[in-house]
A protein has these predicted regions:
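Phosphate/dinucleotide-binding and metal-coordinating scaffold of catalytic cores
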Residues: 1-218
Length: 218
């Protein structure tokens, strides 16, 4: 909420049809509607009204604002590997339930009566080792018994995005979103993004602090 409180906003329901379509609905909880700080999660498609609101997106089964809270290609493949999901199982309603209150942003998701995962303190890691493991995962070469795989599950699914990335605590204790080159790149976008951020800062825009690191991963 705007005042920092964490509250339950509503409930998602998904019914899977034999033809592969998903009938989805969302409804705000009355406690949320009665909250003076309540705001619509999607002003256009999810106004603050009581009762179920149909999704109308049979392939996704959830409103767009909720699907946007999921990771894209990179993070979804991480979730599928972590939970052994088939393509049929890797649909937005099921993926959202696996987040268990994790992820980034203002919206958190968990299955009803399922405990929300607790934030755990992760041991310090060497950036180059984690980056190498992330690239091995993209190549399909990261083995199930690799000691860095559980670490990647913890730091690589929540940031989302279609490209390899993970959260990492630097030596100074600052957390950075580490973005890596992809095997599918014909030109590495990493230095280009860094240059764009630097240019925006020079023009007076407020941008995130960034570093361009060469970890010898080419």
């Amino acid at each position: 909420m705007p005042d920092g409180r964490r509250v339950r906003a509503g409930e998602l329901v998904a019914v899977y049809r034999d033809n592969g379509a998903i009938d989805g609905q969302f409804r705000y909880l009355s406690s949320y509607l009665d909250d003076p700080e309540a705001f619509p999660l999607d002003p256009v498609n999810l106004p603050l009204v009581p009762g179920p609101q149909d999704v109308g997106r049979p392939q996704a089964g959830v409103h767009g604002v909720f699907e946007d809270a999921l990771p894209d290609d990179w993070g979804r493949r991480m979730l599928c590997r972590q939970y052994g999901l088939s393509d049929h199982q890797a649909r937005p309603p099921h993926l959202l339930s696996l987040m268990r209150g994790g992820g980034m942003g203002a919206l958190l998701f968990a299955r009803e009566h399922c405990p929300v995962q607790e934030t755990v303190e992760r041991p310090p890691m060497v950036l180059q080792d984690v980056a190498r493991a992330a690239l091995d995962f993209e190549k399909g070469e990261l083995k199930d018994n690799d000691p860095l795989l559980p670490y990647l599950y913890g730091v690589g699914t929540s940031p989302g995005g279609a490209r390899p990335k993970f959260l990492f605590a630097m030596d100074d204790g600052k957390h950075f979103l580490v973005k890596l080159p992809s095997l599918r790149d014909t030109v590495s976008p990493v230095p280009i993004e860094a240059a764009c951020l630097a240019t925006a800062a020079d023009c007076g825009f407020s941008v995130a602090r960034s570093r361009l690191l060469d970890e010898g991963l080419a």
